[in-house]
Amino acid sequence: PGSAATISVRGIGSISASRSPLIIVDGVPYEGSLNSINNADIESMTVLKDAAANSLYGARGANGVVMITTKKGTNGKTAVSLDAKWGANSRGVKAYKTIRNAGEYYEMFWEALKNANMNIGGMSSAEAAINASQNLVPTLGGYNAYNVDNALLIDPVSGYLNPNAQLLYNEDWQEDPFKNGLRQEYNLSIKGGTEKTSFYASLNFLDDNSYLRNSNFKRYTGRLKLDHQVNDWLKTGFNMAYAQTNTNSPNVGGSNYSSLFYFGQNIAPIYPIYRYDRTGQPILDATGAPAYDYGVTEGHERPYGANANPYAQLMNDIREYTYDIVSAKAYAEVKFLKDFKFTLNLSADNFGYTGVDFQTPIGGDALNVNGRSYRTTQRYFALNTNQLLTYEKTIGDHRFDVLLGHEVKADKKTYLQAMKEQFLIPDNPELSNGAALKDATSYTSEYRLEGFFSRIQYDYKDRYYLTGSYRRDASSRFHPDNRWGNFWSVGASWRISEESFLRDVKAINTLKLKASYGTQGNDALGNDTPYLDQYTVVPQDGAIGITYDWRGNKDLTWEKSNNFNAGIEFGFWDIVSGNVEYFIKETKDLLYYKSMPPSAGLPNIIAVNDMSMKNSGIEAEVEVKIINTNNIKWNVSANITKYKNEVTKLREHIRAMGE
């Protein structure tokens, strides 16, 4: 629980660079993930998809924009709200159908041994059956889950389980690690204000217990928002939020013996989670607790997953991750010369992260090194500021909206990680408890982005709309010769429902045709200085050496996308509303890690802009107001998207190499 959602807007935006949309909270970029925002603080959320809507956000809006507006205070009586929510988490996709009965497994394995004795060993049917009964348990590593002798477990005449056999243990690898988890959330908010000042404050606590044992997510959030109208021409405000998330996240993914899902699907039901003696009594460890079975004990040698027990690792390994997030925003709006407004926005996000990844010395992945622990700390600070100058003018039926802006982003990341092995106390993950330092590393990276942008919007009689925008961005991730990128967009829409021939049709609330085209860039390449050669300092026979880790490429530049969008918005009878849109997104200069010839040495890859990709498709959404009264409101909405992704230039490149 607590994992950040993967958000894709209209398909895959990139191959090697970031595919995540930009998150905007109250008008400024937010560097965190959505799971750190209290849902109860959100007033509205909108997803911007086409180039005309995203153009003002430049390179960071290449994969779409998620616009979030938080709640604010209102003029009037102070209101206090408290709500509590409870729920349950359970496994949604049940385990695949496999043999989960020990007796059935013994019978099937016995049949396989008998057939092998006849087909490979050349034995008669009777000889093969007796041999299979005698070697069944030894072949399975000495594991006998029943209270009869090994050779008597399967009747060699019938091939069935001995009717006198009684099960000594019955553990299910596909069920025992899971449970029903309680989810509880509490929200407290207060809002109010006067004619000039409004305020909103909230506190939130979320405790989300997973359906997997020893796995949970906790979140604490607080928010304070204040807006103040100083006088007729000046308005100011600030918005401060704090969030802490604590995640206990065991290893469950992948296709290895540490994964509960993989291990549980593949291990036979005759192998227990805990150790048992021949009477079926649990064997206790030194602490008096039931001892886990790792498949290698006296008289037992499990042929599958020896030294592995992912359930034991689930309960004994420690994987705890904590984020502390402080976000602050301040703004000032100045109105002057009647039609002009200047807005200054300043936001700062400060992220602190600590992580513990401890693998127990009792058994599992770190058994051979007597335990292993990684400790990680990371600090990320991002500063965003923009200055906006707007001019709004209405002349008769003509309305103009002109925007000029400047934006700067600066961030700094510091990272420190150390790893030790050979731990004295088996449940203490602190590095001071480990004897052997195996790895320690740290780095600091910085990133700068600057942009100048403009937008012109025009409409005539609230019927015909035109918009155009231009933005010029510079990114520190590129060589100075390729640092600047130019991006633009144009759009138009026609509100047909305002035409004289439709204006009096009561069934039609709105009907609008729209189209846009524009270009955008993406600089989120995963490396803050990819145009520079990068090295790591290493020990070399008692001296200082370096390794060549990254082959720089000063010709790297922006990933560029051309976006076309056309659609229709509709609303009928004050009940049904929605839209249908067709889109094409063609991206060129995609980042690609190109293999180098052996003669070039190491590193044997280099990052280049050498791919192209196309996303095209159609999406539709509809909302129906089933009940819309003062006391009851019931809306139902649905959406569907169908798109095709095509990597165009890569196929030509592979064909040219004959692959």
What are the residue ranges of the model-derived segments?
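Short beta-strands and strand-coil junctions in structured, solvent-facing domains, enriched
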Residues: 14-16, 30-32, 51-56, 73-76, ...
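Low-complexity intrinsically disordered tracts that form flexible linkers/tails across taxa
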Residues: 247-273, 650-654
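Residues embedded in well-ordered regular secondary structure
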Residues: 1-5, 15-17, 21, 74-213, ...
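Short, glycine-/polar-rich solvent-exposed loops and beta-turns at beta-strand/coil boundaries
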Residues: 1-3, 35-40, 57-62, 179, ...
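Extracellular/periplasmic, surface-exposed regions of secreted and cell-surface proteins
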Residues: 12, 19-20, 219, 225-234, ...
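Short, T/G/N/S-enriched strand-turn elements that build extracellular solenoid repeat scaffolds
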Residues: 34-35, 650
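Extracytoplasmic beta-strand/coil segments of soluble accessory domains associated
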Residues: 1-26, 44, 54-74
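Phosphoinositide-dependent membrane-docking surfaces
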Residues: 39-49
